[in-house]
Amino acid sequence: MKEIFDGERLQAIERMMQYYRVPGLVFAVFRGDGEPEMHCLGEKNAEAKTGMEPSTRFCMASISKSFTAAVVSKLCDEGKLDLDRPVTDFVPELRYREKQMTLKDMMSHRSGLANHDALWPGDKSRAEVARQMRYLDSNLAFRSKYQYNNTQFVMAGYAAEAVTGRTFEKLLEEYFLGPLGMTETSATEAGIKACGNMAEPYRVFGTTRHRLPFWNMDLAVPAAGVNSSLNDMVKWVRFHMAGGVTKEGERLLSEKAFREMHTPHIGIDAEPVIAGDPLVLEGYGLGWRMGTYRGTPFQMHSGKIEGYSSTQIYLPEKDTGFVIMMNLHDPELVLFHGIMYDALDEAAFGIRSSWLSRFSAEMGLIGEHAGYEAYRELFADYTTPEYKGTDQKQTSGEAHEKEHADLSGTYQNPGYGELMVYKEAGTWMLHYRDQDLPLLPVSGNRFVMDGVKEDTWILRVPVEFAAGGEGGYEVLVKYDESLPPVRF
């Protein structure tokens, strides 16, 4: 395959990386079993100035879902699970309010269950989360609409553990990582620490890039915790391009199981990313999105989590694949789609395009700080008008203190578990999951909590203390905009 990304194109990518404060980026385009064209730009550690390599690992975030779907599909081949029977037939403790919930519903995002991303990560076990699922609310009718849900993939991984007595991580290694020779891939924080070649995660706040601590994703590995390298992700995508067969000719997934993974089970309504967008997203299978690119079918998935972004895509009829990763949380649309479209156009269709330039002009490089709109989209405010309209200065300090009895204590919710309220240096603090955050006074028993991490979002949420039984309090926290506050 003729080299697609020459010096001029690579320089354009590097200019955009500099503009968006991207520390490092790696990508590969490949056809069939030919030598992939790989490029490693920038740095895995911006402070130490250490360069990217094809073996450098990234958190793959939601691309992990394609691995989980493969593990569950393998267990279906072995008769230990079934996509179309209620999951309680196999894992009785994994109960939902919707009693007909199947693994296919869970892994195609059609369950109707609200996101509930506040549940993870943390020090809970997957078994504990499984016992909490029966208490969680839906916000859509069952099987009515596509709604992305990380928690359901965590539970699909737990189902695999429950029927085998082995950890999801060991199943992944035995069924796929080992046979595919993916020696630069793991699914634990310990694996990240041991590899010695992990890209450091970064995120932009305002207009300044900050290095982040690694976010322990061990609980949520089946949804977002697999880490891998460019070398290994090329192997993973090629395995799917070959229909579930290794390069040595060994079939790891039956044709039926592979077909179920890559067949849409729910439609997706998606707007074009840019005018004249050649990529049309149509549906979701099991851990893979699908649609057409220039009228040709594709399979893809993207991932985004604390400090990392990634995309995998392949066109089966063109025997062409593409993988890209960077150690920055957003803005993947401008960079990723521009590079990806240029790569696919030339590799699969023989068209020399300039999508990167178009994305730059239409979505990015306009005005001194225009590109930073991409970062502002990572923040959401769930506070309602009665919170937003209050002058917090009027209720701060001694006057506000007199309004409250002792709010400290441990509060429980059967679906969300335990949170703790305590006072530190005169400020009320709320501990939940892996975060300790200050409660900013609003009025009466109302507070606002900033900096709540849920999946890819940083949230501002309202917190209210309401009178409870025996003269105590209940804590109401609005962790999900589509649901009433969670009552602890």
Segments predicted by a language model, with ranges:
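An acidic site on a long C-lobe helix of protein kinase domains
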Residues: 102, 152, 229-232
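Catalytic loop of the DD-peptidase/beta-lactamase superfamily, centered on the K-T-G motif
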Residues: 1-40, 166, 170-174, 178, ...
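A short secondary-structure junction motif
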Residues: 36, 110-114, 136, 179, ...
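Hydrophobic aliphatic residues
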Residues: 91, 107-111, 180, 240, ...
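Active-site-proximal loop and beta-strand segments within enzyme catalytic domains
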Residues: 3-4, 18-19, 23, 31, ...
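Short, mixed-charge aromatic SLiMs
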Residues: 92-100, 176-186, 262-266
